Amino acid sequence: MRCAVTVRHHGGMDINSRAHFDATPDQVVAMMTDPAWWQDVHRRGGGTTSNAFVTGDSLSLDVAMPAPSQITTFVGSTLTAKQTLSWQPAGPNGSREGTLQIVPQGMPAKADGHASVRPDATGTEVIYTGTFTVSVPLVGKKLEKAAAPHITQAFNMQQDAGNDWLASH
């Protein structure tokens, strides 16, 4: 997975990420709605997951990760967030569209995005597009910039975790 983030001049961050998996769209969506897969993704970043709920093709879970030093004054040593991923029904070719939302607890920040799963010649492409904003006067943009490498790392971990998961399931 390759993730690119761009911090906008007037605040907010654009997130664009692409991954490719040697699997069908149905297999990829099944993986991405499995709490055990997300547990592995977050474990790779030093975090944990809890309170996972799956309803149809939607997943909601709580994530706890070590907080970057720039935000420990706001949240302490652990950053917790509610993560929700919801998929629409499959199209004729198996493609899926969905929404992703991550809301950190204890600070006025939010990530909202769109997810696409599409078949290609050799498997399935996963595309995320979205925004991340921190609504803290005077320091919000600085916090967004500090979050950029952590967001990039989080999306990139999904590629390795996905490859491993699909090889063993």
Describe each model-derived feature in a short phrase.
Residues R18-D22, S86-Q88, S116-R118, T133:
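Generic structural detector for well-ordered beta-strands
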Residues N51-Q101:
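Glycine-rich portal/gate segments that line the openings of hydrophobic small-molecule binding cavities
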Residues C3-A64:
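Hydrophobic ligand-binding cavity/cleft-lining segments
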Residues G46-V54, S86-W87, D112-P119:
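Short amphipathic beta-strand and strand-loop transition segments with alternating hydrophobic
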Residues S95-P149:
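Beta-strand/loop substructures that line and gate deep hydrophobic ligand-binding cavities in soluble
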Residues D14-N16, T78-T84, E97, A109-H114:
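Short, surface-exposed coil-to-beta transition loops
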Residues Q39-G45, N93-G94, M107-A109:
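Short secondary-structure junctions
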Residues T84, Q88-P89, G140-H169:
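A conserved amphipathic terminal alpha-helix motif
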